[in-house]
């Protein structure tokens, strides 16, 4: 799946070391053509992915592409930077080379205010929460960053006239479905699934576009799921996040199979169900069986799921794959769906021919304080057992130190992810850039991540930013403790 131009605010911020900039670092002039971030991002259409910096990170930091090598230019202070190196951050480098830039100063001033006040409140009489005048781009950027920061840290932002959805005419799922009249027959995905995921057809090849964030997706593959790809490529889309953006779902009688809206009718389809997952739970979650294998389909949204495992929760899997299902929303509520979307992904179990040393019986094992602590952080029980087993095998002793245990769990998790086959080949430079971006604080986008939040277990912040947060910016869970970690 390859996303097209992303018309949204991006969070990653990685970039440069040997800058070459213009003579003046002062805001003597601005380039109004690149005032909007999405316009700056569009300028990177021919920006090579081999450079050790991502186009979204540069656009977020106020830069647009000049078309010459890796040279970029700030729309506000007009400073130019090129010869990017691994390990740089776009915002950090921008601050260094152009300390008087209004765009960057707006970001700095806002962060200082947040740290001092702990709970900043936006007070702005202008529509959209942004200045009406376009004469001061630095000020507007500051407001935009303020709103973005407050959203990421779980604070409430009151915008009387939000910028979303991008395409008001496509708020109705029925209207989106009508755009697929000429949908190419070679595409493996059905229009109904795409429309339910907030996407409408652009008329170009198999390209679709989100009515809310404006993000584009194309080159669909048989294994793709519309909601999954939408969430993966545009995780900040308000529609994906479950916010009320005016989406109008189709009536259940049109959307799915009305003759399956009865629990008993769905349950009857599982009469000869040989698979390990409970059929009653599947039927309660809205699913009925189709075919001879374990393929199931929701009577309401029409979403299909298969390859069920014994420990799967049908409600959670339903919420992960098809969060827009009206039946799901009515039965479980939006909060349940949001939690499922933010839930830590289950890692594949590693197959090994070697037997691990026997661990204590589950009853005593589960009472181990280290096991309880790791589970509170979100590590899967199978992963915990595997790491403890390896420790016993290599040393003959179990863990006594929390820091060592968590460090080994993180390493094992990284190795498991690294062992997964890649969907597409990417360059060494791209891999290095992605690894660097994963380690950057998702709040300041500058310093390294060094804190894990307890009990949710999310790794998102540096020590400075973690101190001013009361809730996890990913799942909004109240932070009870902050555990310092060391990432290699």
UniProtKB/Swiss-Prot annotation:
Degraded in a 2-step mechanism; a caspase-independent first step and a caspase-dependent second step. Stabilized indirectly by MAPK, which acts to delay caspase activation, rather than directly phosphorylating xiap. CDD domains: BIR (cd00022), RING-HC_BIRC4_8 (cd16714), UBA_BIRC4_8 (cd14395). Its EC number is 2.3.2.27. The keyword Cell cycle does not apply. Keywords: Apoptosis, Cytoplasm, Developmental protein, Metal-binding, Nucleus, Protease inhibitor, Repeat, Thiol protease inhibitor, Transferase, Ubl conjugation pathway, Wnt signaling pathway, Zinc, Zinc-finger. BIR repeats lie at residues 40-105, 176-241, 266-329. It catalyses: S-ubiquitinyl-[E2 ubiquitin-conjugating enzyme]-L-cysteine + [acceptor protein]-L-lysine = [E2 ubiquitin-conjugating enzyme]-L-cysteine + N(6)-ubiquitinyl-[acceptor protein]-L-lysine. One of its GO terms (molecular function) is ubiquitin-protein transferase activity. It is an enzyme of class 2 (transferase). Pfam families: BIR (PF00653), UBA_BIRC2-3 (PF21290), zf-C3HC4_3 (PF13920). GO terms for biological process: apoptotic process; negative regulation of apoptotic process; negative regulation of proteolysis; nucleotide-binding oligomerization domain containing 2 signaling pathway; positive regulation of canonical NF-kappaB signal transduction; positive regulation of canonical Wnt signaling pathway; positive regulation of protein linear polyubiquitination; positive regulation of protein ubiquitination. Gene3D superfamilies: DNA helicase RuvA subunit, C-terminal domain, Inhibitor Of Apoptosis Protein (2mihbC-IAP-1), Chain A, Zinc/RING finger domain, C3HC4 (zinc finger). A zinc finger (RING-type) spans 441-476. SMART domains: BIR (SM00238), RING (SM00184). It comes from the Eukaryota. It is found in: Cytoplasm; Nucleus. The BIR and RING-type domains are dispensable for anti-apoptotic function. Belongs to the IAP family. Monomer, and homodimer. Multi-functional protein which regulates not only caspases and apoptosis, but also acts as an E3 ubiquitin-protein ligase mediating ubiquitination and subsequent proteasomal degradation of its target proteins. Acts as a direct caspase inhibitor. E3 ubiquitin-protein ligase that acts as an important regulator of innate immunity by mediating 'Lys-63'-linked polyubiquitination of ripk2 downstream of NOD1 and NOD2, thereby transforming ripk2 into a scaffolding protein for downstream effectors, ultimately leading to activation of the NF-kappa-B and MAP kinases signaling. This is E3 ubiquitin-protein ligase XIAP. It comes from Xenopus laevis. The gene is xiap.
